Structure formats: C-alpha cells, structure tokens
Amino acid sequence: MGKYGEIQSGFMEERTRILDALDLPENKHITLRLIGALAFRTHCPKYGYFQDALGRVFTDIDFAGYSKQYKDIVRLLTELGYEEDKMVTRLFGDFRLVLHEDKFGRHIDVFLDKLDFCHVLPLKGRLEVDKPTIPLAELVIEKMQIVQINEKDIIDTIMVFREHRVGDTDKEFINGKLISKLTSDDWGLWRTLTGNLTLVESYLTKYPQLTDEDRRVVTENINELRTWIDAAPKSLKWKSRAVIGEKKKWYKDVEALEDRT
C-alpha cells in the first residue's frame, strides 16, 4: 500500500483519494483543481445523476495547476501511484503533464497555467477562486470552446446549466461577467461558444429523461448567458476580426493527445 492508500477502481473513489491527499498539511500549498467530466459531477451534487441517466461515462481524471508547482505536482501524483510520462513532458511540459497507473490502466492529465485547445483559456489567478474544481465559468468555457464538440460535452453542459444560475460572481454561479469579458475580446471564442450554446439548446428535446422543468431552467440560463455576451462592449480587435468572419479559420485543430477531457 502506498503513502495515500491503494489506487481505487472507481473514478469517483479515486477522485476522492486524490482530493483527500491534497487536503493534507504537506500538500495544502499545491493548487490543483479538477477539470473535465469529474469536475462537472463534483460541482453538480443535485443533478450529477444526469451523467448516468444520459449515458455519460468517465474515461480519465483531469486537473489544472500551475507550472511553478510542477515538481510538487509530480511528487504528489507519484506518491499516489502514478508515473510521469516523460515523453509528454519533453514535448509539452511547459503546459501539460500526463501520468499513468498500471493497475487499472488510467491516466491523469494536468494542464498548466491555461487550457489550450481550440481556443486558449488562461487560468493564472483563477484556480484560487474555487475548490476542488476550476470555477464554473471556466467549466462552461472548457466545453463550449470545442469546435468539434461531442455529445458527452453537451451532457456535461446541460447538467451544469441545470444546477447553477448565471450571474456576476463566481460563488456557485456561472460568472457571465467573466465569460462575456473573454468573448468580447476574442471573436473566434465568441463564434465557437455562442454556436455551441445554440447546439446545446437544440439537444434538450433529444433526451426523454429530462423534464419540462429541466429544459425550461437550462434554456433560461443559456439565454441569460447570451444576454451577458451580447451586452458586453466588443473590443477593436473583436470588431476587426468579425469583419473577416468565417472566411478565415478562427480556431485551432486539437491533436488526439489533447482530446481527452
């Protein structure tokens, strides 16, 4: 048995083991926040069952952290029974770590300082805002910035919009003020995010497991976020890029290694 007990077979149980280790005095200085499906489940205790009801399965455990704590992050996850993928570190170590465990064949992704997928989402100064996940605004953007979005991402987004209202704060709210600030300076992010909000809304009638009240609340919150986004003054950079529109590619393609969240 390792320092923090045995690796657990269930994703939720393994998540808890890692979070418990982070709460110990020797690790409290490490800023490591859940992202991905497990983060949505953690932040949606009331409606987390949506993932099960709609067929959403867990495939890995993902975190966000700070590059300045790279050594401490690797040390902790190694003590938890994971082994650093040195090749990934050599290729992407300034913003990405991958660690593996052999018992159940799982891996942990750790994204450092930013989420860099179809669009870049900076995280510096934001990881301290919430715990044990990244803030709700970043959870929404994490999914809504994916150009080739999957159904699993749509399910996660429906769930978070059912559980949490949109407002101008981070505490148990989806921070529409912050999201609108980011989309008002980046036309590409605005284009992808607003398009995906419409797609999420269109999926609400697909799932008979959802009640009319579920659909009403999710639609209401999507519309509230749209109101924030539409009302935010757009930067000169945004306006200049909007003139070009979709004639020029507005997003980055995501490599297979990065498409795991």
Regions found by a protein language model. Give the residues of each.
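Generic beta-strand structural signal
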Residues: 61, 95-97, 106-109, 130-132, ...
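Short, solvent-exposed polar/charged micro-motifs at secondary-structure junctions
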Residues: 43-45, 96-100, 120, 181-183
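Active-site nucleotide-donor binding segment shared across nucleotidyl transfer reactions
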Residues: 19-74, 134-135, 243-246, 250-261
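Catalytic cores of NTP-dependent nucleotidyl/adenyl transfer enzymes across multiple folds
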Residues: 112-261
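N-terminal regions immediately upstream of nucleotidyltransferase
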Residues: 1-22
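Short, flexible active-site-adjacent loop segments at beta-strand->alpha-helix junctions, enriched
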Residues: 38, 69, 103-105, 114-116, ...
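Conserved catalytic core of two-metal-ion nucleotidyltransferases
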Residues: 74, 78-119
